[in-house]
């Protein structure tokens, strides 16, 4: 009985952490889907969301909702400026070069935040209290529900946007074939800019809602970004739902690994499974293999 | 004749000048701190404090009429850089003693250099291996992790709690704590039921805590630096963990209470006395030093002085005492340092000897508990 209780707790904790990974994974997938770039500055957008909210709350004394809006808006602008200054000017750059640029940008953003706001970890107050909620013998916090809720909303939003709006469809067209998209009159440049804006906003939102749980500092983006990237890879870098499932599986495995096998090997277990997936199903867990037409 | 007189006069004048110059020549002290990089939370207050104390000594007339000159370099927490800078201090700057570095890794890396150059080193890092075994030229001011462990175990023994769970962070600090927790357990009749770790960047420790909740442990001892322990405190509250939670001295700052919020309530930890200086009994030997340091730091930096600054305060003051008693040669300073007894500093009351270059006992720590977002002494 005790073991069963424990396992329930491991799974619930894992799902909660996993949905954080899922949300960050989604913002990776958005940029990848329309540009083919893996944006390694994504973790920094997450960090900016948290840090800017705390700044607006504590220094500008804004109410929580306004602080969140300011943080998401500012991060979105940073995403836009980043695309304009670092991605757009490079004509005919290979994806590898662009990826290296995003790594450079992530180091720059991290350094600037460290200089501006210092190295201290800071906590954001929980949105609706810290009284634990009991579910089937396990407990979770109200903040976890916020994370679940926002993740679901973001998935639905992405689905609607990419499948049912003209801009969303245009962005998907760019990812399939840039040249063809250009030929039918889609402004590829604008779509790339769009994707950075959306993914910066989603990343920042993720950063805001997880800040009360995980706390935030200038360097939280690295690990969160990496885990989110894993989630996106497991989901095959594409379909919204795949990435979400990828995140949830990663979180649950970590938690079960830490609880049942050894907490020292928690990350090793998760990354080992990631490697296995990359070897066996490089196209992701939930994607059918694509056949290249000749 | 005339020439002779002028030569004599000139040489006399030169002699006067050179003695004047000699009297004004400051005593050079080297300092290595990790002001930037991951250990900057140690290095920054240490550098601030060292400079503050040296300035004050100079303002009050220096040591035996001679000013001190502090030559500070930033190691960035990088052992390779620490080695280069230590060489620079010894060879180019020709310092008579070195204080710092901030981290155990940096300190271990430069020990061969100071031993070879025969320059005394007062390290501000905590690792017990810095002074165990004793090295002729190496001393330290930060309290050994083992003393903090002893303080916790002593309390558990007093409360007749013999079964504990430990949860340590997987970095140098946690590994050292874990080693000490395991090594000293038998001595206090304590049994470690579960031994778990977490990563320094982990954001959820409920898995480990759920496992501990299911065990027979009567107390949880967690070893880490912020923000991990704050996450653990919150997770423990979420899971309704009912056993007492002990943290390490790694989180003995107000920042921990701020991060953990309500979840910090009731958590106990061994801490240096800086934190609770105003709560100490009037007859405490360290009280005067502590209050002076806190007031001074507040005046200079508009921030609360912490242990880390305290380590540098102790190092400079110990050095000052040694120069007063042993002169300004490296060998003289070393011998006088080793002969230091009952020096009430910030980290504790130091008594060095030929067999002990760490100089502190477990009384350097005091056990505190978080109550109403503040510290109280555990009786």
Question: How would you describe each model-predicted region?
Answer:
Chain B
Residues 11-17:
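Sec-dependent N-terminal signal peptides of Gram-positive bacterial secreted proteins and lipoproteins
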Residues 2-9, 23-379:
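Extracytosolic ligand-binding ectodomains
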Residues 17-23:
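Sec/Tat signal peptide C-region and signal peptidase I cleavage site
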């Amino acid at each position: 009985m005790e073991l069963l209780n424990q396992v329930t707790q491991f799974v619930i904790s894992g799902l909660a952490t996993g949905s954080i990974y899922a949300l960050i994974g989604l913002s990776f997938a958005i940029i990848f889907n329309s540009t083919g770039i893996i944006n390694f500055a994504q973790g920094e957008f997450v960090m900016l969301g948290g840090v800017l909210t705390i700044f607006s709350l504590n220094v500008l004394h804004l109410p929580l909702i306004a602080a969140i809006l300011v943080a998401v808006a500012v991060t979105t602008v940073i995403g836009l400026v980043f695309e304009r200054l670092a991605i757009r000017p490079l004509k005919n750059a290979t994806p590898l070069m662009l990826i290296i640029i995003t790594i450079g940008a992530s180091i720059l953003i991290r350094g600037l935040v460290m200089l501006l706001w210092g190295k201290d970890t800071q906590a954001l107050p929980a949105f609706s209290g810290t009284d634990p909620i009991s579910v089937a013998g396990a407990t979770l916090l109200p903040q976890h529900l916020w994370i679940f809720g926002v993740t679901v909303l973001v998935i639905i939003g992405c689905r609607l946007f990419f499948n049912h709006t003209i801009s969303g469809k245009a962005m998907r067209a760019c990812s399939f074939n840039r040249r063809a998209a250009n030929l039918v009159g889609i402004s590829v440049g604008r779509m790339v800019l769009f994707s950075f804006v959306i993914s910066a906003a989603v990343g920042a939102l993720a950063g805001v809602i997880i800040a009360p749980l995980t706390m935030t500092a200038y360097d939280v983006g690295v690990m969160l970004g990496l885990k989110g990237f894993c989630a996106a890879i497991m989901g095959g870098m594409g379909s919204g739902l795949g990435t979400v499932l990828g995140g949830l599986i990663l979180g649950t495995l970590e938690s079960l690994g830490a609880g049942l096998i050894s907490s020292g090997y928690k990350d090793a277990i998760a990354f080992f499974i990631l490697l296995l997936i990359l070897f066996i199903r490089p196209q992701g867990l939930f994607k059918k293999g694509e056949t290249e037409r000749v | 004749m005339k020439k002779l007189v002028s030569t004599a006069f000139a040489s006399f004048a030169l002699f006067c000048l050179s003695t004047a110059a000699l009297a004004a020549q400051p005593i050079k002290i080297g300092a290595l701190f990790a002001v930037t990089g991951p250990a900057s939370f140690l290095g920054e207050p240490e550098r601030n404090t060292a400079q503050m104390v040296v300035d004050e000594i100079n303002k009050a007339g220096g040591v035996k009429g001679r000013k001190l000159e502090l030559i500070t370099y930033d190691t960035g927490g990088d052992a390779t850089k620490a080695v280069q800078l230590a060489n620079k201090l010894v060879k180019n700057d020709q310092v008579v003693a070195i204080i710092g570095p901030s981290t155990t890794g940096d300190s271990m890396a430069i020990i061969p250099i100071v031993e070879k150059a025969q320059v005394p080193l007062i390290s501000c890092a905590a690792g017990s291996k810095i002074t165990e075994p004793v090295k002729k030229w190496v001393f330290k001011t930060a309290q050994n992790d083992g003393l903090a462990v002893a303080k916790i175990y002593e309390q558990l023994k007093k409360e007749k709690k013999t079964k504990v769970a430990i949860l340590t962070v997987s970095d140098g600090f946690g590994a050292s704590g874990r080693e000490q927790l395991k090594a000293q357990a038998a001595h206090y009749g304590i049994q470690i039921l579960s031994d778990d770790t977490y990563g320094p960047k982990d954001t959820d420790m409920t898995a480990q805590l759920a496992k501990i909740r299911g065990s027979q442990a009567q107390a949880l001892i967690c070893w880490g630096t912020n923000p991990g322990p704050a996450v653990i405190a919150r997770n423990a509250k979420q899971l309704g963990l009912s056993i007492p939670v002990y943290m390490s001295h790694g989180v003995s700052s107000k920042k921990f209470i701020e991060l953990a919020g309500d979840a910090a309530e009731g958590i106990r930890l061994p801490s240096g006395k800086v934190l609770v200086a105003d709560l100490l009994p009037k007859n405490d030997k360290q009280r005067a030093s502590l209050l002076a340091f806190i007031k001074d730091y507040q005046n200079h930096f508009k921030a609360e002085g912490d242990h880390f600054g305290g380590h540098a305060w102790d190092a400079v003051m110990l050095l000052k005492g040694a120069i007063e008693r042993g002169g300004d040669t490296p060998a003289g300073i070393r011998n006088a340092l080793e002969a230091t007894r009952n020096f009430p500093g910030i980290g504790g009351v130091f008594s060095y000897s030929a067999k002990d270059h760490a100089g502190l006992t477990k009384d350097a720590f005091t056990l505190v508990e978080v109550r109403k977002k503040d510290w109280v002494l555990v009786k």
